[in-house]
């Protein structure tokens, strides 16, 4: 399993997976940097897709991400309430 950076090439994978954990983050976010080692450890067991909100602002807005870091579980593209 791994951390997967969302790009234009794999964006549809995010929406089409049955279940996926998604982290919304930004490189300038201090809390995101502090969470990174934890996610790296967790990603040994599950895939986590990472969305840089600066690169995918519309996607962040469509999932109503208001603060970062934000962790969501998507089931068939539908988001749960944020985990953090």
Predicted regions and their residues:
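Hydrophobic beta-strand anchors of alpha/beta hydrolase catalytic cores
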Residues: 21-22, 48, 71
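Short active-site neighborhood of thiol/selenol oxidoreductases, capturing the structured segment around
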Residues: 15-27
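Typically the conserved alpha-helix immediately C-terminal to a functionally engaged Cys/Sec
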Residues: 31-45
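N-terminal leader/targeting and pre-domain segments
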Residues: 1-18
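Non-catalytic, surface beta->alpha helical segment in thiol-disulfide oxidoreductase systems
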Residues: 67, 72-84
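Conserved beta-strand segments of alpha/beta enzyme cores
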Residues: 2, 47-49
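The canonical Cys-X-X-Cys-His
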Residues: 29-32, 71
